[in-house]
């Protein structure tokens, strides 16, 4: 500190006017400061050294043209302003506390301010870096990381700290919050601010960042935010992103950010049973991602390299959910699948019994809420035979639902595999609304066994539909004492879904309202 500074302002950095002798009334001269107290030899020595080191008085500059006129003008202005104006002006330069009546205002004033600062941060890299002033006490009070940095066992004594991995705007947002509780984030800075808040353990600011992201979550940024949520370990935000992707899958996978996600995020999405999109469109999106990943890894974009970068993600594409036409026109010709896989899938599409394939054939259901089911029979009996004729029953409901599958009876002869084709037909137009050619395994019990559609089938209120199941396999159990009307009541809302069953005209393999197959309808409301 310069010898002319005030002893009561020792913590102030050079050049900041905060006390007498700095821009105000003249303080003691250098020679006066060097005068020791009588009888104090140590002080005398120190004062002598200070006096020797102090520069001599600076000679006044020679008067230039107009100097006298300028001085006279200044005197006239001071007289016009009144005798106390100059003193008030000088006081305002250092007595900033007087205009800040609350602690919050005083600390907010110190934000990004050289006044009283005792540490500087060199934030960022290269030309974009900034030198930001701060106050150790304020930072230590607001952050355990800063507390350890300044006061812990390995505390730094440096007054300049480099932070090359932090963005200046994000660090300023962090300081703004620590000094004033004010949240200053926007779309361009929220992710870097979240990173900085986590780095310095400021959970309240983390929560503000996550809340901002939730409010601004859309289909076109869901994948980008999902990647960041997984990176920063924000499970609640990640869950919201996945729900948004489920509901808006088609829009999300066409957004620019989709091809920028990492492999683990891609796998997390492909594992979901709740994506609302046809599998062939999902495959096409994954192919686009593989091209971008090849470029990131500086690999030539070839079918072999696409397969390489996809890794385990390829096994999560549910090729059996495609139609044979979709598979033949796309995946079969892509070169990503090996010949053995292509042949196996073509056999799966065309022959019965269907050979097992390496790929998942479980349908994706894009519906939210709890799965429901009703059973129309009150009792189970033995021996129901099959000769290639469909078991059919007509039904209607009182409200809109989505049917995702049927529960069917299995063998009376122990564990057995069945081949089955299930359909829902619009009765009046004879239009097939949904079907699946698949199979199921049973354990020989009288339980029902789930057989699911590839996609949910929308069923409208008070419209007649026909449920069909064509089984190939040994004699099975069957239901008796059938109910014409069955009501499902939601345990949470009390809402009622009422099914009415009727005889379906034609050959039904014996199934009717009273007895037969297709005991169970599985649906979402």
From Swiss-Prot:
Q: Which SMART domains match?
A: BACK (SM00875), BTB (SM00225)
Chief site of localization: cytoplasm
Q: Output compositional bias ranges, type Gly residues.
A: 16-26
Region (Disordered), start-end ranges: 1-86
Q: Name one GO biological process term.
A: neurogenesis
Q: Which PROSITE patterns match?
A: BTB (PS50097)
Q: Provide the BTB domain boundaries.
A: 117-187
Which ranges are annotated Pro residues under compositional bias? 56-65
User: Compositional bias of type Low complexity: which residue ranges?
Assistant: 27-55, 66-86
Please provide, in alphabetical order, the Gene Ontology terms of the cellular component aspect for this entry: cytosol; P-body
Do you know which InterPro entries this protein is assigned to? BACK, BTB/POZ_dom, PHR, PHR_sf, SKP1/BTB/POZ_sf
Pfam families named among the record's database cross-references: BACK, BTB, PHR
Record carries keyword Nucleotidyltransferase? no
**Cellular compartment(s):** Cytoplasm
Subunit structure and binding partners: Interacts with topoisomerase 1 and with TRIM5 isoform Delta.
UniProt protein name: BTB/POZ domain-containing protein 2
Q: Which organism is it from?
A: Homo sapiens
């Amino acid at each position: 500190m310069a010898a002319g500074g005030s002893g009561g302002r020792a913590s102030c950095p050079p050049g900041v006017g905060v006390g007498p002798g700095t821009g105000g009334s003249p303080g003691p001269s250098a020679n006066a400061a060097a005068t020791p107290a009588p009888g104090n030899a140590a002080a005398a020595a120190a004062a002598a050294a200070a006096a020797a080191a102090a520069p001599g008085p600076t000679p006044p500059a020679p008067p230039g043209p107009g100097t006298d006129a300028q001085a006279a003008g200044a005197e006239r202005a001071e007289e016009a302003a009144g005798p106390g104006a100059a003193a008030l002006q000088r006081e305002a330069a250092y007595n900033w506390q007087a205009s800040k009546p609350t602690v919050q205002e005083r600390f907010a004033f110190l934000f990004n301010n050289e006044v009283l600062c005792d540490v500087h941060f060199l934030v960022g890299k290269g030309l974009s870096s900034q030198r930001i002033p701060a106050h150790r006490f304020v930072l230590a009070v607001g952050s355990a990381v800063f507390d350890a940095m300044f006061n812990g066992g390995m505390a730094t004594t440096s007054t300049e700290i480099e932070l090359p991995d932090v963005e200046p705007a994000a660090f300023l947002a962090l300081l703004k919050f620590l000094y004033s509780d004010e949240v200053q984030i926007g779309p361009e800075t929220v992710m870097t601010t979240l990173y900085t808040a986590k780095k310095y353990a400021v959970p309240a600011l983390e929560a503000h960042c996550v809340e901002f992201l939730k409010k601004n979550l859309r289909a076109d940024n869901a994948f980008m935010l999902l990647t960041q949520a997984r990176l920063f370990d924000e499970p609640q935000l990640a869950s919201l992103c996945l729900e948004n992707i489920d509901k808006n899958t088609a829009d999300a996978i066409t957004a620019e950010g989709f091809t920028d996600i990492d492999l683990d995020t891609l796998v997390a999405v492909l594992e979901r049973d709740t994506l609302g999109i046809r599998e062939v469109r999902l495959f096409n999106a994954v192919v686009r991602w593989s091209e971008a990943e090849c470029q990131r890894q500086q690999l030539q974009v070839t079918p072999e390299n696409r397969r390489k970068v996809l890794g385990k993600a390829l096994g999560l594409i549910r090729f059996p959910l495609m139609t044979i036409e979709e598979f033949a026109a796309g995946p079969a010709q892509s070169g990503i699948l090996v010949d053995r896989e292509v042949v196996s899938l073509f056999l799966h599409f065309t022959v019965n019994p269907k050979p097992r394939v390496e790929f998942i054939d479980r349908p994706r259901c894009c519906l939210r809420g709890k799965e429901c089911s009703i059973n129309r029979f009150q009792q189970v009996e033995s021996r129901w035979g099959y000769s290639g004729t469909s078991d059919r029953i007509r039904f209607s409901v009182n409200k809109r639902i989505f049917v995702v599958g049927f529960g069917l009876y299995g063998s009376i002869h122990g564990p057995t595999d069945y081949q089955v084709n299930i359909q829902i037909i619009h009765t009046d137009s004879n239009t097939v609304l949904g079907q699946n050619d698949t199979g199921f395994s049973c354990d020989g019990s009288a339980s029902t066994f789930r057989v699911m559609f590839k996609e949910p089938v929308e069923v409208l209120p008070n419209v007649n539909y026909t449920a069909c199941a064509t089984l190939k396999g040994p004699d099975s159990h069957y239901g008796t004492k059938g109910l014409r009307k069955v009501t499902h009541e939601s345990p949470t809302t009390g809402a009622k879904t009422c099914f009415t069953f009727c005889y379906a005209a034609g050959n039904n393999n014996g199934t009717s309202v009273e007895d037969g197959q297709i005991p169970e309808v599985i649906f979402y409301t």
